[in-house]
Amino acid sequence: MFTNPEQNILRLGLKEGMRVADFGAGTGFYSKACSSRVGPTGKVYAIEVQKDLVKKLESEVKHWGLTNVDCIWGDIERRNGTKISDQSMNVVIISNVLFQAEDKLGLIDEAKRILKKGGE
């Protein structure tokens, strides 16, 4: 059973202006929940490896009117696969995706690379 994005996001203590990477964003439930918490000065990077899901997510983001969400086609299991700069994220979300990863350590390494020191 998948977890509830809204309830999980509350536990992260997201604040206005934070930068969040959503690994394996899928249809954007976590990205949408984060968007309202980080506000217009924050940014959510919704990263998905499946091109068809990226297109669907881009459509949803537009439909929802979210201006602070960027949809990225990327490989979360490969170094620099997310196309995000080193130590630039306050939070990296890895929900409902780790069990599917073929290279779990690669995924963790990519999250660690983009996470700021002291990030979550």
What are these regions (language model features)?
Residues 15, 39, 102, 116:
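Short conserved AdoMet
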Residues 19, 43, 118-120:
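Short glycine-centered segments of the SAM/dcSAM-binding site in methyltransferase folds
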Residues 21, 27-80:
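Class I SAM-dependent methyltransferase SAM/SAH-binding core
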